[in-house]
Amino acid sequence: MTTQNPVYASQAKPWLKYYDQKFIDQTLPTLSAFDFVCHRNQNHLNDTALDYYGRKFTYADLIVNVKKTAAALRGVGVKKGDIVTVVSVMTPEVIALFYAADMIGATLNLVDPRYSVEGIHEYIEEVDSHLLVCLNVVYERCRQAAKRTNVEKVIVLSPADSLPPVMAVGYKLTTPDKNKYASNVIRWKQFIKGGEGQSIAAEPYDPDHTCIVVHTGGTTGSPKGVMLTDNCFNALAQQFRAYDKLFHRGQKLMNIMPPFIAYGYACGVHLPLVLGFTVIIIPNLDPAKLGSLVLKYKPEHMFGVPAHYQQLAADPKLRDKDLSFILNYAAGGDSLSRGAEQTVNDFLAAHGARYPIAKGYGMTEVSSAATVAAGLDNKPGSVGIPMVNTIIAAFEPGTDRELPIGERGELCISGPTTMKGYYNKADETAMILRRHPDGRIWVHTGDMGYLDEDGFVFLDSRIKRMIIRHDGFKVFPSMIENVVSRHPAVHQCSVVGCTDKDHVQGRLPFVYIVLKADTTAKKKQVIRELERMCAEELPEYVQPVAYKFISSMPMTPVGKVDYRQLEADISPRDY
């Protein structure tokens, strides 16, 4: 009897069988992010690059606007190596600003406009910005946040700056600007005009140049600024060219994600522009209107989070609509239970879509995406296969000892989209970026999962979401969520840990449930049925201690389930 030798993902790379050899062998561009967009679209300058509430910008328009913005940045004293803090939603101006800063060797520090004065102040001070760019609607908070910093000038833009003329008038009537601006404020159009006569020469390509700093809790929970380079952005876009059966020049992508997360800029702006798409900009999504926006614009592509697609599947406005235009609607940023995945896939199939929900997995530290399940290369429950130039493997948690395919461990990522590091946090950078004996730099994600024999990645849970019982048994929330979400009355569910009342240490799994709006099932009946399902399908130590019904899941500002809030909301009376 022979013993089969273990197979290791980092060596076997079984996922490569799904890719064309020309993409496996491709070299990554040695260009700035802006130059890559220009290079890819040099023969398509009259194609539409951006659509902002019906106002269209061609690629030629975009390039002109970027160069004008670059000149304007130089006009206010920005130079190579400077970091400009931007507090805004996605608008054409913010997109031009990204590429303009890139062109002159500067960096954007992207901050969520919903942050408090203290939060904005902290992020300005951390990178020592001398220039602040903000939306007019958050100017007062930004003015206060800029106190006791080195900010010298503030550029203020309005969501109306690029609206079609009639809409711009309507916006200004319904949302008048009542700010009292300080003397150091420059309005956007005045800012652009101030760049006249300044140089529009691009800085030479620098492989070490940081395009943006985006902020994340990362794997330890403390706020950190993730530095992403031109190479990170370009490598992400270049790898997506391997999905050429789905992605074709001239298609539309609706960008519903904000600019202050890597997902919003890397997948929502740079990727589609490199592929020659039209980017439909939705600066401030109302989730209830997502279905109407999909019907209005008919985008073939969209990147969102699982909650967006559950919203679409439950939207009565889409009940009898033809959605055959959908090619790649991708869910990332949060876990998608098997029940929710099946619900969304049934919805897509019933409305004429050719492919199931596309899934991806990644993190800010790898420029948002590391795996893709696109088209028919898709297994239920998985988050797809590694991108063509990316390697993923499972390791014994916290070590460099790789585990064989099929064994659960800490998922680690190695590839060209890996961040440069955390801004001014060398110790924390060293914790997550580690050179292994194979010579590669690996990102230690803090996520538990495994790869199957075909190279599909299956995600169990973040290590920090893992529930450890009093007896040391480990419970992954996804184990329970995958069972509970299949109940026909359940719209959404999330599992968190609660205190074990019978032991001095350890936690127990607690299930939150949102019922479907049209369900007629009684709550007590649903609980009895869920208890039976869990008893039949899960080990004894994984059984939930209690179930609680809520009207909706609390969400973080970027659309992920707020697990910390769910944990805080558990009362001793609930179980």
Q: Which residues make up each language-model segment?
A:
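Conserved AMP-binding A3 loop
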Residues: 58-60, 211-235
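Conserved pre-ATP/AMP-binding loop-to-beta segment of ANL
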Residues: 178-215, 222, 245-252
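AMP-binding/adenylate-forming catalytic core of the ANL superfamily
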Residues: 115, 132-134, 302, 415, ...
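Conserved structural elements of the adenylate-forming
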Residues: 63-68, 193-196, 207, 226-246, ...
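Conserved AMP-binding/adenylation subdomain of ANL enzymes
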Residues: 234-252, 260-303, 307, 311, ...
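AMP-binding/adenylate-forming catalytic domain of the ANL superfamily
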Residues: 157, 536-561
